[in-house]
Each structure stands twice: as C-alpha cells, then as structure tokens.
Amino acid sequence: MVVINSLRRLARTTQVHLHSKYATCMSGNSTSRRIFTTEAAPEKKNTVGSKGHDMLAPFTAGWQSADLDPLVIAKSEGSYVYDDTGKKYLDSLAGLWCTALGGNEPRLVSAAVEQLNTLPFYHSFWNRTTKPSLDLAKVLLEMFTANKMAKAFFTSGGSDANDTQVKLVWYYNNALGRPEKKKFIARKKSYHGSTLISASLSGLPPLHQNFDLPAPFVLHTDCPHYWRFHLPGETEEEFSTRLAKNLEDLIIKEGPETIGAFIAEPVMGAGGVIPPPATYFEKVQAVVKKYDILFIADEVICAFGRLGTMFGCDKYNIKPDLVTLAKALSSAYMPIGAILMSQEVADVINSHSSKLGVFSHGFTYSGHPVSCAVAIEALKIYKERNIPEYVAKVAPRFQDGVKAFASGSPIIGETRGTGLILGTEFVDNKSPNEPFPPEWGVGAFFGAECQKHGMLVRVAGDGILMSPPLIISPEEIDELISIYGKALKATEEKVKELKAQHKK
C-alpha cells in the first residue's frame, strides 16, 4: 500500500521530482503511463476507455480505477494473453498462479460445454449430488499419496476452502470434547485467502489493515525466509532448528491444549515465493505432532505440478491431516476449491454429524457439476502428459536462466524458487537490510518495462513474482528470460538515475 500511495504522489509530481529523461520515458511509454501517471491513456481504435469503470476492483487502489484505464485482457492462447488492442503478452504468472494448462486447452472447454448441455447445475445438499462431484472426489483421494486421505469437500475457491478448514478443525475438536483447542498458527508473510478468516490466517499486514483483522484466535510464527532472517553464520539447518524452537515456544506459551492447527504453504507464494529452508518441514512437523496439533497443507499454488512434483507435499515430505486445493485444480477454467481430510479427521466428523443429525456446512456451489467436470479433465491431462515430469525437465532452464542475472546486478538481493515458480527481490547493495525508498517504485518500474516488452509479471512492492503456465515451452522460457533481462537493464539505469538525483 505504501508503494501504491507513493506512486500516486510520484504521478502527480513527475515534472518536479524527476529528471527530464525519466519524464520523457514516462510520457513516451503507454505502459509506464498506466502505472506511474494519472494521465489518460492515448486514444485507441476500436476500443472504449474504461477509466472510472463501475467495478470495485480487487487489490486495486481507488485512484487507479478512477484515474487510469485498466489493462483489459480480451483473449488467451497457450502461454500468452492479448489485450483489447491486440497486443500480445507472455503471461509469466499464469493469471494468478492458476492457468496451469494455458489459455485455450480445448479439452477443458469441451468438458465444460458437454456438462453444461447435460446438467448445468445441481447441488450436493441432503444426500443429493451429481456424478462429476462424486468422480472428482474419488480421483483426488487416489491422486494425493503423501498421506492417506479419506474424504473430499468442495468449495468455490481457496479462500472459502481455508475458511472451511477452520470450521472443520473446530468441529473436530468439539466432537473430541476439546472445545478449548481452537487457535490457529500460521506464518508471517503467508497467504491463505482474503475472506474474513482466510485473511486472518494470512500473514500479510495489508490484508488486516482497516478490516479489524486478524481474528483473535489466529497467531503468526516466523516466516521461514533464510536470506532475509538468518543470523550471521547460521546455516539453513540451524535456521530451521531455531524456527521450530520458536514455534514450540509459542505453543507452550499459549498452551498446547488451545492450539488446534498449524497451516503452511509448501512454498510461500504471494508473500514473495519463499521455498522452505533445509529440514524446515521435518522439524516443524515433529513439533506439531508432539502437541497433537493438526497440520494443514495449503496446496492452492503448489499442487498439480508447479514444483515438479504432483503436490508440494511430495517434494517436502509433508504428511498433512488436511489439504487445501484450488487454482490449477481446474486450470482456473472454472472456479473450484477442495479440501482433503485424513481418515482420522473424516471419521470424527462423520461420527459427530451422525449424532447431531446433520453436518451443517456447505455452499450452493459445493461440487458444482461444471467445475467438477472441468477439474476431472484437467487432472486427466496432468497425468496423461506427465506435467510434473515436464516441469522438472524445463525448470532448470527457467530457474538458471533468471537466476543468472542476480550475480551481476547491483539491485537484485535474491532470486529464489523451484520448479516453475520464482521470485526476485530488489534491494540496494544486495542487502536484505537496505530496501529502496518506497516512493522510487523500483518493482513497479520493472513490471512496467516487462509489460512494454510484452510480458506480464506480478509486482509485490520491490518483489517480482513469476509462475508461468506449466505447459510453457523451452522457447517461451527463453523469451521470458530475454524480456526479464531487458527490463532489468532499464531498471538498473533508472535506479542509477534516482540515486544520482537523491544525492543532489
């Protein structure tokens, strides 16, 4: 939010605070203008400007909707999307980490159309349901092998799935006669959704500010970002030991009898793409198990091949009690989320609901037949095309190609990732303790340069996040690396200018 507000001020004071070269760059570049200034975009043929549109846009500042034309995406094709002027962009974030099979997979479209023509909707309440929802549950339970799962529950996406996780844990502990075992421990910089409870679980302050969050039953422990938070001379293994000890100390302080669950992403996504340090999950799981605390694996971003394994739990030997799925579950062609629960959890919930007469939780769109049909087809494709194996094969080209820029760049502090997910963090002097002034908007400038050259990235402050479609070709990876390099060079020059200006 600081960066957005700073960019707004920067936009209003361009001529005063920037060298003429920067002003020329901004005034001559429609992509930069969209991000950095309040000047309207130039007239485009065959398109109607949408500045001041009627939608309350998610994760967008009010001034952006009021003052700027949005980038309107009109078409997708493979690893690319096209805006309403016909300009082509390599979609390096796969939408929002989710269009795993690219933008025009005909089998997914056919699955949706066939189901729409057969049964466009029916619910799953009161022991009524549809074949696609039953079939998808069966496939998912067979597919997830990190721990034996017994039941699946469907939602519309990841946020309401994580809300449901909280209710399940509470229901489970009430059934066991442990009504005080209700607190949740999540991690700083985690992301688990933006609804009331999932935003509380998330460890990102902007999701809490002015929403009266987080909820009081949610606690946050250390972010496992080794580069940023390790002590001098501390190895990754020692760092993991310290974080596991801090987690145990928090549990003891609060009282183990009050902690119901611990939730974690295998690789943290929106918080900056943060893979776990060595031995982290081994040590954290031991602590959680010691105090009879359920482990929830939030696989919304990592599942279905993103890390080069079918699930993130497979890569890091995580054996969860509950799992959250969404995004690539349908390659985002239809909204759907899912929860998988272990036999122990499922047995307790089934027994308790039988005593009460009903399990009083669900949504209109739980197990929506069209969403389930598309998800089933997506899972078939992941298996038939060996998508996790393909990701493992092309990942070195992606990871090594982007990371190669880090050693020679004075503004890259760290480039980190695994499989087809990667984050870059811009800092001064390559130090985690020397961020650039927020008003410089270094990350936003890099994003604008990428967009100018035909690639969309996710900007998170001075962090750049990438997770391209899992079907990205080697040639497209090379294009991604090339555009990244061009944007980086321009950003380095811009930082040099801003530093010179700052010294005056």
From Swiss-Prot:
Disruption phenotype: No vegetative phenotype. Oversensitivity to ionic stress but not to osmotic stress. Sustained roots growth upon treatment with E-2-hexenal. Increased gamma-amino butyric acid (GABA) in leaves and flowers and defects in pollen tube growth, guidance and fertility. Cell elongation defects. Suppresses partially the ENF1 disruption pleiotropic developmental phenotypes (including abaxialized and adaxialized leaves). Changing residue 98 to Y: In her1-1; loss of E2-hexenal responses. Induction: Not induced by hypoxia. Up-regulated by salt stress. Expressed in flowers, siliques, stems, leaves, shoots and roots. Detected in reproductive tissues, in the stigma, style, abscission zone of siliques, stamens and pollen. Not found in pollen tubes or the transmitting tract. In vegetative tissues, found in dark-grown hypocotyls, leaves, guard cells and primary roots, including the root tips and the elongation zones. Not found in the division zone of the root. Expressed in the outermost layer of the shoot apical meristem (SAM). It is found in: Mitochondrion. Transaminase that degrades gamma-amino butyric acid (GABA) and uses pyruvate or glyoxylate as amino-group acceptor, but not 2-oxoglutarate. The pyruvate-dependent activity is reversible while the glyoxylate-dependent activity is irreversible. Cannot use beta-alanine, ornithine, acetylornithine, serine, glycine, asparagine, glutamine, glutamate, valine, leucine, isoleucine, methionine, phenylalanine, histidine, lysine, arginine, aspartate, threonine, tyrosine, tryptophan, proline, or cysteine as amino donors. Substrate binds at residues 191, 327, 362, 458. Gene3D superfamilies: Aspartate Aminotransferase, domain 1, Type I PLP-dependent aspartate aminotransferase-like (Major domain). Pfam families: Aminotran_3. Changing residue 271 to E: In pop2-6; Loss of activity and complete sterility. Pyridoxal 5'-phosphate binds at residues 158-159, 298, 363-364. It catalyses: 4-aminobutanoate + pyruvate = succinate semialdehyde + L-alanine; 4-aminobutanoate + glyoxylate = succinate semialdehyde + glycine. Its main location: mitochondrion. This is Gamma-aminobutyrate transaminase POP2, mitochondrial. The modification N6-(pyridoxal phosphate)lysine is found at residue 327. GO terms for cellular component: cytosol; Golgi apparatus; mitochondrion; plant-type vacuole. Residues 1-18 form a transit peptide. NCBIfam families: PRK06105.1 (NF004767). The keyword Transferase applies. Changing residue 103 to N: In her1-2; loss of E2-hexenal responses. The gene is POP2.
